């Protein structure tokens, strides 16, 4: 399909309905059903291991091997379910999901079907524009991950590949799959999906149950999209597509937006939307057809015969609940009140994804406004240029130290930016950067000498200020700052000049 209708035109006649499946790899030491090291776990060295080295007979589905349940993975799943506002099941019951694919060595996946670990949850989602939606969560169930295929082609994709290799290091990694109920967010649907996944990432990081690196596949999202003609009955859900394995927040939003446009184009031209899986091509900004989407009965679920139901005591659930940190949504509300931020100010922090950094900077001694200024401004700008996370550039303690030096009059904003750059670029401490580049403000005696000289050499400008044209003071301030190499407080200089030239 070469051309699709615009997003605005698609929304005129159709209401988008989305459903989200978010797969979260748990960061346990070992896999879900075996003692093999977890490639998504806390040991960074695992990620650099060669293919098919983190496996056991259980991971490979060898005859005679039997699974045993990782209790820590169950605890992590319960904690995540509670954080999603879900009820927790009384028993842990596994089922076999039967299908054939090369990355599934047993030809079935141990998952859950009728009795998920957690169910009936809800998350509050707020978009950048301040619109609030409630995404209902149908279930969050525990399952094992599949292996990973490496397609040998110029693009790394299966299309045109001469052959594919299989790495079973990921096989058996514990997953929680979070399944939403249909979301009706109209034109905000792509944004709501992105913010929903972003909030889940924030939750799992606060709980410490996942590394939550989307680019490494620790969190993957499948986005179901269908369009309903406006005015059609609310109970009717048309054919849907499922765009698989979206692994960036940007891709989630763009893929859903494109799929809405693509389906609207098909329906408007009299064609049917095929119920299928699709794959997102980030480089082209389009989705491509995958395979016909299977219904649940085609997986022939049945109870896992090698794992008996495991009771989940209520006191265990309560103990996990009491051990959980403050929920990110509660944290947001508390910090907004403590910092006395307006809705716009706080949304700026959230949209820049630096809430944790601002909080830690404030706790290190900076003012909320000062911490926000640096993290949402200069640091975010540098991170955007370098395509990295702001948190990877500088510590909150260093930012707090810079802000404190500004408040003490040792640095001004211009010098502070130079200090910041040196700390980031050269891994210096704040004090090392100041000493290396002589970046502290000039002493007051030197400032006074420069001020006297500037006033005596600019009598015409001085007379303008005296006559009431106070905007001319900017010329005098600029001359002083130039003579001092920027090492002065411009606002204090301005006030000093006005106090000296104007009658009180």
Curated annotation (Swiss-Prot):
Signal peptide: none
Keywords: ATP-binding, Ligase, Nucleotide-binding, Protein biosynthesis
Keyword ATP-binding in record: yes
InterPro entries attached to this UniProt entry: Asn/Gln-tRNA_amidoTrfase_suB/E, Asn/Gln-tRNA_Trfase_suB/E_cat, Asn/Gln_amidotransferase, Asn/Gln_tRNA_amidoTrase-B-like, GatB, GatB_Yqey_C_2, Gln-tRNA_amidoTrfase_suB_CS, Gln_synth/guanido_kin_cat_dom
EC number(s) from the headed UniProt entry: 6.3.5.-
PANTHER family documented for this protein: GLUTAMYL-TRNA GLN AMIDOTRANSFERASE SUBUNIT B MITOCHONDRIAL AND PROKARYOTIC PET112-RELATED, GLUTAMYL-TRNA(GLN) AMIDOTRANSFERASE SUBUNIT B, MITOCHONDRIAL
Assembly and interaction partners: Heterotrimer of A, B and C subunits.
Stated name of the protein: Aspartyl/glutamyl-tRNA(Asn/Gln) amidotransferase subunit B
Naturally occurring in which organism (per UniProt): Tropheryma whipplei (strain Twist)
């Amino acid at each position: 399909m070469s051309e699709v209708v615009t997003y605005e035109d698609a929304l005129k006649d159709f209401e988008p309905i989305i459903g989200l499946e978010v797969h979260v790899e748990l960061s346990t030491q070992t896999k879900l059903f075996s003692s093999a090291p977890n490639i998504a776990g806390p040991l960074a060295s695992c990620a650099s291991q060669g293919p098919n080295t983190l496996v056991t007979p259980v991971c490979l589905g060898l005859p005679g091997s039997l699974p045993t349940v990782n209790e820590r993975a169950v605890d992590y799943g319960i904690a995540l379910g509670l954080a999603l506002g879900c009820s927790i099941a009384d028993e842990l019951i596994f089922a076999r999901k039967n299908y054939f694919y090369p990355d599934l060595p047993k030809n079935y996946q141990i998952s859950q079907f009728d009795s998920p670990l957690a169910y009936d949850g809800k998350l509050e989602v707020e978009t950048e524009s301040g619109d609030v939606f409630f995404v209902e969560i149908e279930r969050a169930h525990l399952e094992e991950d599949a292996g990973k295929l490496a397609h040998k082609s110029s693009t790394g994709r299966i299309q045109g590949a001469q052959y594919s290799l299989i790495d079973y290091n990921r096989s058996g990694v514990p997953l929680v799959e979070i399944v939403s109920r249909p979301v009706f967010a109209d034109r905000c649907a792509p944004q709501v999906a992105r913010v929903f996944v972003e909030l889940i990432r924030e939750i799992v990081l606060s709980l410490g149950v996942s590394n939550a690196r989307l680019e490494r596949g620790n969190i993957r999202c499948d986005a179901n999209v269908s369009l309903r003609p406006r005015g059609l009955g609310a109970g009717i859900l048309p054919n849907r597509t499922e765009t698989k394995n979206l692994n960036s927040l940007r891709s989630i939003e763009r893929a859903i937006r494109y799929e809405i446009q693509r389906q609207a184009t098909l329906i408007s031209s009299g064609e049917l939307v095929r119920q299928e899986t699709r794959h997102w091509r980030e480089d082209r900004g389009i989705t491509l057809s995958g395979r016909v989407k299977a219904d649940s009965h085609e997986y022939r679920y049945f109870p896992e015969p090698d794992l008996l139901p495991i009771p989940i005591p209520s006191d265990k659930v309560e103990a996990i609940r009491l051990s959980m940190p403050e929920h990110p949504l509660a944290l947001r509300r508390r910090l907004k009140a403590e910092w006395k931020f307006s809705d716009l100010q706080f949304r700026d922090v959230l949209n820049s994804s630096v809430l944790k950094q601002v909080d830690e900077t404030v706790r290190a001694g900076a003012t909320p406004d000062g911490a926000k200024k640096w993290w949402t401004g200069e640091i975010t700008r540098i991170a955007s240029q370098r395509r990295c996370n702001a948190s990877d550039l500088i510590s909150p303690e260093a930012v707090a130290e810079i802000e404190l030096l500004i408040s003490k009059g040792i640095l001004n904003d211009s010098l502070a930016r130079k200090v910041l750059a040196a700390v980031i670029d050269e891994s210096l401490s704040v004090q090392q950067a100041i000493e290396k580049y002589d970046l502290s403000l000039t002493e007051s005696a030197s400032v006074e000498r420069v001020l006297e000289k500037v006033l005596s050499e600019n009598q015409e400008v001085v007379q303008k200020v005296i006559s009431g044209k106070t905007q001319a003071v900017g010329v005098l301030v600029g001359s002083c700052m130039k003579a001092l190499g920027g090492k002065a407080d411009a606002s204090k200089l301005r006030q000093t000049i006005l106090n000296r030239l104007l009658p009180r």
